[in-house]
Curated annotation (Swiss-Prot):
This is Flagellin FljM. In C.crescentus, the flagellar filament is composed of multiple flagellins of 29 kDa; 27 kDa and 25 kDa. It comes from Caulobacter vibrioides (strain ATCC 19089 / CIP 103742 / CB 15) (Caulobacter crescentus). It is found in: Secreted; Bacterial flagellum. Flagellin is the subunit protein which polymerizes to form the filaments of bacterial flagella. Transmembrane segments: none annotated. InterPro entries: Flagellin, Flagellin_C, Flagellin_N. Belongs to the bacterial flagellin family. GO terms for molecular function: structural molecule activity. One of its GO terms (cellular component) is bacterial-type flagellum.
Length: 273
């Protein structure tokens, strides 16, 4: 049987406990809605918070990986552009050498062709030396390979350099001809240089494709990590909004229950009137 006491109002105490519990839940839900997160700190859930922090750090480090790979892309793109120019120049050099091999040419015409040939040769040197991105080149013979970040653990994506200088193509700074016979011989030399250049460019193209593929993978991996972190810590706002309305109603009822419980002491007084 319930005990009526003016010293202890157990009904009010229970109502107050329930109201405090509701208020605590309400504060938590409001915080989740305000921040958009169900796990905002280690005290919310230490294990999940730690996992989310680690995954978030890994996802963040992927930005450095993407930056490095994009530099790699640009470095290769510059080398490929220079290579296109160089193969065009070699084609024109072959044309000049072929024309100069004509024994029916007069001296003036021969010398003009030789001058054009020499000028085209020198342009190859300029094209190769200017094939730099951010001061780095894989076409000018200054390096054998370049390594770019491949993952957050520091592993590398390595690109083998392809020298497109005159020396790298089997030519020299003095490669030329002084007779029609020498011009004819030069045709074969240029053909070899052209084949060498196209082979090197094909290899760079393969490296570029591989780098592009890996960059796409890194982007998808970063997106997956971000999504995973979101699944761990992000709040379901639709669910929290519905819960907020429910708790607000519960809070109002709790206030009324506490008010009713507090009135029980007054009802005891009426027994003595």
């Amino acid at each position: 049987m319930a005990l009526n006491s003016i010293n202890t109002n157990s009904g009010a105490l229970i109502a107050l406990q329930n109201l405090n519990s509701t208020n605590a839940e309400l504060t938590q839900v409001q915080q989740r809605i305000n921040t958009g997160k169900k796990i905002g700190s280690a005290k919310d859930n230490g294990a999940i918070w730690a996992t989310a922090k680690n995954q978030s750090a890994t996802a963040g480090s992927m930005n450095a990986v993407k930056d490095s790979l994009q530099r790699g892309q640009s470095t290769i793109d510059v080398a490929l552009a220079a290579g296109d120019t160089i193969t065009d120049l070699l084609g024109k050099m072959k044309e000049k050498a072929l024309a100069a091999s004509d024994t029916s040419l007069n001296t003036a015409s021969f010398n003009a062709l030789k001058s054009d040939f020499d000028s085209l040769r020198d342009q190859i040197t300029k094209a190769a030396s200017n094939a730099k991105f951010n001061g780095v080149s894989i076409a000018d013979g200054t390096t054998t390979k370049l390594s770019f970040l491949a993952n957050s653990d520091g592993s590398a994506f390595t690109v083998t350099a392809k020298t497109l200088t005159l020396g790298g193509l089997g030519l020299t700074a003095t490669s030329s001809f002084t007779t029609a016979a020498a011009a004819k011989t030069m045709i074969g030399t240029i053909d070899t240089a052209l084949q060498t250049a196209t082979n090197k460019l094909a290899s760079l193209g393969t490296s570029s494709t591989g780098l592009d593929t890996h960059l796409t993978f890194v982007g998808k991996l970063q997106d997956s990590l971000d999504a995973g972190v979101g699944n761990l810590v992000d709040a379901d706002l639709a669910k929290e909004s519905a819960k907020l309305q429910s708790l607000q109603t519960k809070q109002q009822l709790g206030v009324q229950a506490l008010s009713i419980a507090n009135q029980s002491s007054s009802s005891i007084l009426s027994l003595f009137r």
